[in-house]
Amino acid sequence: MSVIDVNPIPLAPRISEAGVADYIALLKPRVMSLVVFTALVGLLMAPGSFHPVLAITAIICIAVGGGAAGALNMWYEDDIDAKMTRTANRPIPRGRVTRPEALTFGMTLAFFSVVTLGILVNWIAAGLLAFTIFFYVVIYTMWLKRWTAQNIVIGGAAGALPPVVAWASVTGSLAVEPILLFLIIFFWTPPHFWALALFRNDDYARAGVPMLPVVAGPDHTRLQILLYTVALVAVAAAPWPLGYFDVIYGVASLALGGWMLVLAVRVYRHRSGSAALRATRNLFKFSILYLFALFAILLVEVVAAAVLRLIG
């Protein structure tokens, strides 16, 4: 069993007062963009009428809740961030924002996002948003990430919940469709983050994070990436023959999934040298495009169906 060093290193002292850009960085805007986009698709797919103001309110609350979770993640992981090249320039390690400031910022945003969603939209959606924040901050950040190589697999549930929250904002209930969206993101998460972990392996090892390549080795990680990619392709395509999504989505999901599978096979085959590094980077980059494209196609289908209803 590997011994992981999780002892923190001293953080940089405050070098100046925090600016707006520092607090925006705490929100993890790149992650937030994915949260907003998948939530928007979930909201527009939901049946029934929904006032535009409430729709905008729901999306903003989900985005702010996701940002709050990101800020609380940075608050708790300041020791890890300081050790990793990829994260050393974040506001807390750089001394731009203190840990108490990040904690206060994150808790305030979390509270107001949940309460606002509950009061103005409905409390089922608010409860799901609160659970999402709790799962990401407590279950994933505080527990899973430091203690198990399955951190990404289990913790990925938090990142898969935004379209479920958005659907519940409209309907006040759950259904098969948002669960399908959840499953797509859930199975997408391991190949995406394990590809990152492969070419950032030294970074994670230095920080004491038990990512799969650190604990089980790169070769086992490559196998798991391939297996989860196969599962992802099947899960993403399944809604079409089951009658939940249309043929355009079905064909596109197979095409996108087929190429992602090709990239995963390349990761599995190339195990050393520049070819291995190139394969993992290509899979990581394409996985981002894959998810955005898949949900964009769903968005187009929803908008097209709405237009046809109006002119029909």
From Swiss-Prot:
Catalysed reaction, written as an equation: heme b + (2E,6E)-farnesyl diphosphate + H2O = Fe(II)-heme o + diphosphate
Keyword Cell inner membrane: yes
Enzyme's top EC category: transferase
Signal peptide positions (record): none
Membrane-spanning residues: 31-51, 52-72, 119-139, 152-172, 179-199, 225-245, 247-267, 288-308
Keyword list, A-Z: Cell inner membrane, Cell membrane, Heme biosynthesis, Membrane, Transferase, Transmembrane, Transmembrane helix
InterPro entries (UniProt xref): Protohaem_IX_farnesylTrfase, UbiA_prenyltransferase, UbiA_prenylTrfase_CS, UbiA_sf
Superkingdom of this protein's organism: Bacteria
EC number: 2.5.1.141
GO molecular-function terms, A-Z: protoheme IX farnesyltransferase activity
Pathway membership: Porphyrin-containing compound metabolism; heme O biosynthesis; heme O from protoheme: step 1/1
Subcellular location: Cell inner membrane
GO CC entries: plasma membrane
Family: Belongs to the UbiA prenyltransferase family. Protoheme IX farnesyltransferase subfamily.
Further comment: Carbon 2 of the heme B porphyrin ring is defined according to the Fischer nomenclature.
Name assigned to this protein: Protoheme IX farnesyltransferase
